[in-house]
A protein has these predicted regions:
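Glycoside hydrolase catalytic-domain context in secreted enzymes
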Residues: 1-136
Length: 136
């Protein structure tokens, strides 16, 4: 769906999400071992997918064992819609696209306020550096 793709809120049960919608991604991550994956614009049960620690960290990283880079889709951060850069980083996105000045300030402010930890920032940076070394 392209209409309202940044605002659509998919209301879905955990079972349906896992058995139908995430299954193909799980197979791709486990069998394909991609270096990077991209989070999406839409909301899932009221949370922007790029801001979802459940999707990006708990499922992709911990359950599926994904250790590569997670990046947001282009212009995912739309503060007036509730999707902000620091929440993307806290959820497990390593690269927030396109990486504008507002996104950088959002991350700095969240760090100063204690909403984003140094450990989370270092983890993101580490995965980016690992990807760079793999591609060099």
């Amino acid at each position: 769906q392209e209409d309202n793709r940044m605002g659509v809120d998919v209301k879905i049960s955990e079972r349906t999400l896992r058995e139908i919608y995430l299954r193909g991604f799980e197979i791709a991550v486990k069998e394909g071992q991609p270096a990077a994956i991209m989070s999406s614009y839409n909301l899932v049960n009221g949370v922007h997918a790029a801001n979802s620690k459940d999707l990006c960290t708990r499922i992709a990283r911990k359950e599926w064992g994904f250790d590569g880079v997670i990046m947001s889709d282009w212009n995912t951060t739309v503060p007036e819609d509730g999707s902000v850069a620091w929440k993307c980083a806290a959820a497990g996105n390593d690269i927030i696209m396109p990486g504008n000045a507002e996104d950088a300030e959002s991350i700095r402010k969240a760090y100063r306020n204690g909403d984003l930890t140094e450990e989370e920032i270092r983890s993101c940076a580490g995965r980016i550096l690992k990807l760079i070394s793999q591609l060099a």
